[in-house]
């Protein structure tokens, strides 16, 4: 089955690669319109997936990732329309020159070809990835988790219907609908047809792809995100950022998981933090150094375990620990972070610049929430993933990250001397 899907995707990629921007945008607008027109069908499929998830004991955090509502679906359709307004990178000349040997040489952006994406309980990924791949002239093979197979099937059917209406191959967007895990292993070996693989899920999925795939893999999306509260902060402003970073959408990979507080302000700041987090329904997981300042406060407090520093909560839970200074904060992030998104809250320009230089994450913030690590917030449109590696892309992966380049040489019946 996958062999045929791969062949069909590769054939479709050749057709997509030569489409004009107008043709691609027409397809995307048709997809957005049909997503809204067929929303009842998609939401009904999602409701069945969600019912199974509850019955199987899925955590509330993962249920939130799985859930589609009319509002969320409308926002996704709006994101697709936003992709139309983005500049098409395909065909752009990156650089060029006239060489001494008479060759006019240029480097031009081209599609990758076929992209494979493996993801878990995230039905929005189906549409986000499909829209970005289509805009950049790439075909895509999607493998969502078993938790979302009804939602994904309904969504891909709508996308393929839109493609057919626009005279484009339905095989440009395909989904592996079977929940059989063996098909994941087969996809990882489909390097004859698939040019890049992107896993979006937990650490286990990323490890499997890194170790087993014969296709180049882009890993990331696991976000153990930190905020360091320096001793120079404005308490009220800092608490607002911390609250938003934690509770705006706790299940997101860019939500705050560990708060590092300069020990010089612990006696004044942590009681205020307790009030803020209590109002937001956040449970604090305190280190031994932070516990005395939080015990007896209004927020629920438990002792942090060392393993908590290395994992995503994806829920209304927050690790809190004290650090002596900026050096200690950076050291903690280096030891426990995932190079996703980390922030400093400070009024010291010197400390801000040091933090930016020394924290080696894909996105680093000064006096801003980690929640900004998002393709839409970065002006990239819907993202295909957030890469925490350094090759071939880093951070939110927008359109350019779904292209490569080719060298093109022009001559006048030119031969090499």
UniProtKB/Swiss-Prot annotation:
PROSITE patterns: PROA. The keyword Oxidoreductase applies. GO terms for biological process: L-proline biosynthetic process. One of its GO terms (molecular function) is NADP binding. Its EC number is 1.2.1.41. CDD domains: ALDH_F18-19_ProA-GPR (cd07079). It is found in: Cytoplasm. SUPFAM superfamilies: ALDH-like. GO terms for cellular component: cytoplasm. InterPro entries: Ald_DH/histidinol_DH, Ald_DH_C, Ald_DH_N, Aldehyde_DH_dom, G-glutamylP_reductase_CS, Glu-5-SA_DH, GPR_dom. It is an enzyme of class 1 (oxidoreductase). It catalyses: L-glutamate 5-semialdehyde + phosphate + NADP(+) = L-glutamyl 5-phosphate + NADPH + H(+). NCBIfam families: PRK00197.1, proA. Catalyzes the NADPH-dependent reduction of L-glutamate 5-phosphate into L-glutamate 5-semialdehyde and phosphate. The product spontaneously undergoes cyclization to form 1-pyrroline-5-carboxylate. This is Gamma-glutamyl phosphate reductase.
């Amino acid at each position: 089955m996958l062999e045929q899907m791969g062949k069909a995707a590769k054939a479709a990629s050749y057709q997509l690669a030569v489409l004009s921007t107008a043709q691609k945008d027409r397809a995307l607008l048709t997809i957005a319109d049909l997503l809204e027109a067929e929303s009842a069908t998609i939401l009904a499929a999602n409701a069945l997936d969600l019912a199974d998830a509850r019955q199987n004991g899925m955590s509330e955090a993962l249920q939130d990732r799985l859930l589609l509502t009319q509002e969320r679906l409308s926002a996704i359709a709006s994101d697709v329309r936003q992709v139309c307004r983005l500049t098409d990178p395909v065909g752009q000349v990156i650089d060029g020159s006239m060489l001494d040997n008479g060759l006019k040489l240029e480097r031009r952006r081209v599609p990758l070809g076929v992209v494979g994406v493996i993801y878990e309980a995230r039905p929005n990924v189906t549409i986000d990835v499909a829209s970005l791949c289509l805009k950049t002239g790439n075909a895509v093979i999607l493998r969502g988790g078993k938790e979302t197979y009804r939602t994904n099937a309904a969504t891909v059917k709508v996308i393929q219907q839109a493609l057919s209406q626009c005279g484009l191959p339905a095989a440009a967007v395909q989904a592996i609908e079977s929940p059989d895990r063996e098909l994941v292993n087969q996809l990882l070996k489909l390097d004859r047809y698939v040019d890049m693989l992107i896993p979006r899920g937990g650490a286990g999925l990323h490890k499997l792809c890194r170790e087993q795939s014969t296709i180049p893999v882009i890993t990331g999306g696991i976000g153990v995100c930190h905020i360091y509260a320096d001793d120079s902060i404005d308490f009220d402003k800092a608490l607002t950022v911390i609250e938003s970073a934690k509770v705006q959408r706790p299940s997101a990979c860019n939500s705050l998981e560990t708060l590092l507080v300069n020990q010089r302000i612990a006696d004044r700041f942590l009681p205020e933090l307790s009030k803020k987090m209590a109002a937001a329904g956040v449970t604090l997981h305190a280190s031994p150094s932070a516990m005395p300042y939080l015990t007896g406060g209004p927020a629920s407090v438990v002792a942090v375990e060392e393993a908590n520093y290395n994992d995503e909560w994806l829920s209304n839970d927050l690790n809190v620990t004290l650090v002596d200074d900026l050096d200690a904060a950076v050291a903690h992030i280096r030891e426990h972070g995932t190079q996703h998104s980390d922030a400093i809250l400070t009024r010291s320009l010197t400390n801000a610049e040091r933090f930016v230089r020394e924290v080696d994450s894909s996105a680093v913030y000064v006096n801003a929430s980690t929640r900004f690590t998002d393709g839409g917030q970065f002006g990239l449109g819907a993202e295909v993933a957030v890469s925490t590696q350094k090759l071939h892309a880093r951070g939110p992966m927008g359109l350019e990250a779904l292209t490569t380049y080719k060298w093109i040489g022009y001559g006048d019946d030119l031969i090499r001397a």
